[in-house]
Structure formats: structure tokens, C-alpha cells
Amino acid sequence: VGTAPTKEVRFIDSLNRRAYAYRYKNLDSSYLPAEQAYGQARLYQQGKAEACNNLGFCAFMQMDFERAEKIYKEVYGLTKNELELLIADIGLMKIYQRTGMNKEYYDYRNSAVRRMKRIREDSTVFTDKYEMLRVNFAFTEFFIVSSVYYYYLQQRPEAMASLDKIPLDA
């Protein structure tokens, strides 16, 4: 496996950053650069994995859960990057929560918990401001998704405890 050229890495990263920046502002403006990053990533598999996470988010927001699931699952074959894998885990948690697939929800939740522990143990790896933003967002989203799940199960104390774990400085 070769190393991606710097030009490709910078281009794909810029597309992914644009997709991420628009995710809650304009879904179309998020989708288009994510699709472009996915299609143009040749050797930069981590960038393609990030594009998958952005595309999975868009599909989820459009309530196309089958497509979102397929896209998120593709991440596992593209990278070993714990952040991208964590984001895919959380995306799948959200899908399985919405579709009532409790076993699958817990499988990916347990995977996310293990990844979060590894990320915390090796937090010096994430020095880039954008990466830190994504780490903080992923952790926050994990606790929100967990809280909603507990709330649906009428486990209010657990739901509140999960919300209390959201880092305030994130």
C-alpha cells in the first residue's frame, strides 16, 4: 500500500472539512463535498473513511437508514484510525437506536466505549485543531445518543448521568 501524495491529502482534507462545516447548516452543502472527497480519494484511505462518515451522516439525516448503515460499515475496511472508527460506531448506534435493533446498538456502543478509552489513553495523537474538534464532537454525540437511548427505555437517572459526562470544555 502506497502513501497518498500530499496534494491528494490536502485536497481531500479540504473537501471533508467543508462537508463537516456544513453538516448542521445545509445538508446539500455537506453532501456534495463529501461525495467529491469519496470519489476522488485514490490512495488516501483515511480521507475516504472520513468522507464515508460525512456521507453516512447525510444519509442518516435524510432517514435513509439502510444507505447510512452501508456507508458507515465501509469505514471499517478503509482505515484503522480510531477517530474515524469511533464516528462510524456512533453513527451505527444512532441507526440501530432509531430502528429498534437493541443488540446491534449495544454491540456498537461497546465498541465505541473501547475506542473512547484508547483515544483518551493516547490523546497526544490528536494535536490538530480540527481533529480535536471532531474528537470532542464524537464524545459529546456518544453521550447524547446514549442518553436518548436510556430515556426511551424510561431510565431517567441513566439518561441524566450520560448527559453529565459531556465535557463542558468541548
PLM-predicted stretches and their roles:
Residues 1-170:
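A "functional boundary" signal
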